[in-house]
Amino acid sequence: MAKTTNGKFWNDECEKVSDLLWKPNLIVNHKPQERINFKCDNKYITFNYYSNNVPINDQLKFKDIPQSNNTDKKNKLMDKLLKIEDSRYKKDIESNKTRKIKLTKEQLTAKHNTQLLKIQNKISQLDGFIRSRRIQLLPNDFQKNIFNIWFNETTVIYNRLLTEFTQYYIKFKEIASDNKELVKLLRTNEEFPLSLQKLRNLKIHDIINIYLEDQLIHKLETPFCVIANTIKEFVANVKGNLTKLAENKIDKFTFKHKNFNGKIRTISIDSKYASENSFYPDKLGKLLQTYEDLKGFSWKNVKHDFKIVYDKYNNKYYAHIPKYVYRNLNILNKKPITVMDPGERTFQTLYGLDHVISIGDNLRETISKRLLRIDNLKSKLDTPGSKKHNLKLNRKTRVRKCRYKKAIDRHHKKIEHLQRELHYKTAIYLCENYQRIMVTDFSSKKVSSKDGDLDAMSKRILGKISHYRFRQRLQQKCEEFNCQYLEVNEAWTSKTCCNCGYIHAKLGTSKIYDCPKCKQKRDRDVNGAINILLKNRKLVLMEDQ
């Protein structure tokens, strides 16, 4: 075991590896290079690349990246599906002998070959990942009206199911002695079964005859497939909460009805109803244009069930279509590793052995301006005495307050779009340029707790940046680009000197790490990123280092 010398993680091995690393001194006077391969034109997302053109030390030997092997899984699934298909094929041949209109041998063989091809496609999908693609729809007025009818009718159905289930929940809660007994009573209730097929068969006539009559909807316009998917969504939501309740992860769960005026409204569509240029062509027409038509999108290529989403704020319709994405193995000349130090002043500081990158240096200023505008607009909405005054609001005041609310939503959307672009552009850049990506378990939730020493604005900014969501998105991209994703702990990496291991107890919020022991000065975030690598070196470096 290595002997500890200074820091909480620092030892002789850390010092040995540290001597092999390029440790840049203060980079504030270095001229940043151009945006190397960073495909982002947003002026609010800065990208600064610093390098002294120092080659990576040849003595740094990295472990091989573990590759996922699905061979055993593929073989098991192949054997299972082939047995099922062989059995079906034999039964088909036997039953064909007694048919009045018999199929030819060529027809039976063609059907068998089609099934074998489907099995082969299913096996190949084990090498891929399901990802959702968002397609903007361009419906005409008639199609918009149809969508709105479907949204309203499915909302009525969902809310009525929820109301009925709530009655049983309250009834059984009074009888049950604990949560497990309550869950058992709800799951075994034959009057309101929590099986999709049973509930659908039991309630489908009530939906047609009772649910919609209460809302003065006399003719059901929504296809049965969409209604069935609404019931499926309801059952999935209830079952998920009941599982948590049985495991005592929650004490109770509230029943929230869907809002007819919600900002986001969704319905689910089965892929089998998609035609060449639309879906449900008998109801929507033979052509449903999309924003992606010029980029080669075609409805006939839709192979999985999808969702139609209406964004009320933007007044736009989208189709969220799942598809299989396979690993991109064609990118060569990647750097061996990058280590990331997250923050609030700078979104990410990257250390790549021979270069340093900072992404999102001015995000605090950009986001804080939006948040202050939101606070200002909210103060106008919640002026003292406004509750009494609101009883006799005139039309002009109502219009003004409505504009304030829209402006607040607009600022939130601007921040959300900035966050989304920042996350995805950064993730794609990392995956295209590095073999291994080391991130920290930096949690905005922990930072925003009452015990933290950050001011209120910093906590709000960290919440909007959402490092946790970025890690989720980055992990997905690492799967697609065949990169090794490493999530590690960053404790004591900021206060420890990456050159000598001294712990700077009085570092505070300083941007510069000025080591009192070895007298070296460097950027605080760069020092932290190097220490993250040193602390977790055994995950990526060979044992002899």
Curated annotation (Swiss-Prot):
It comes from the Viruses. Keywords: DNA recombination, DNA-binding, Metal-binding, Transposition, Zinc. The keyword Zinc applies. This is Putative transposase R104. InterPro entries: Cas12f1-like_TNB, Recombinase/Transposase-rel. One of its GO terms (molecular function) is DNA binding. The lineage of its organism: Viruses, Varidnaviria, Bamfordvirae, Nucleocytoviricota, Megaviricetes. It comes from Acanthamoeba polyphaga mimivirus. One of its GO terms (biological process) is DNA recombination. Zn(2+) binds at C497, C500, C515, C518. Belongs to the transposase 35 family.
